[in-house]
Amino acid sequence: MNKQKPEQNVQMISFDDYIKKFDKLVQKYIPPKKDWTPPDQAVYGPKDPFRVPLKEGKELQFNAIKYQFKNHYENNNMYNSFCKQMNIAPSDIKKYDDIEKIPLIPGEFYKDYPNGRDFAMWLANIFTGHIPQVKISGKNPNFDDVINSFNASGFVVSYSSGTSGRHTFIPRDSRTFDISEYAIAKNSITMAYPVCSQTMMMINKKLFHGGIFNQG
């Protein structure tokens, strides 16, 4: 005769505590609140990214996009020239509907790049912000050589899986990379709550601490 196991009294963790545990786990990805920019506020601010009131969400979105448009316009010569050809400047973005005016670079652009040292120059030309000194060894470096040299200099070169036959490469500063990684992780654990709360927390802990997210 089989004995019935006593029911276990499992207490569900509250969503507030769930997010607090997550933020504690990924603290190194969160900049001090006093240093938050509008994009930081949009990503780190909402406790639940899927339940932000529409009016508040549109305000966060508008401020973040306008800030980043101005940032790329002023700190990326290639994008600045592209916007001037389209006759669009940050001063033209005054209300939410103006977001549609912001020039977008086609994804195919990031798949069209040269080889060797010319690839390094290509990465530098599409980067937004101050470009640190990058030392590349060898006369004919391959893609990995160039990427590793950039990463060692403070860049984070993200790239796609290349399933289409060619990788997409996008160079970022470490802070921009961190905010994107945080957003991916927070969205995943928020969607999983409460069904897989403990499992997802363990997965994200392994991802962050194991360095999987740092592969780009």
Short names for language-model regions:
Residues 2-159, 166-203, 209-216:
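Nucleotide 5′-phosphate-binding alpha/beta core
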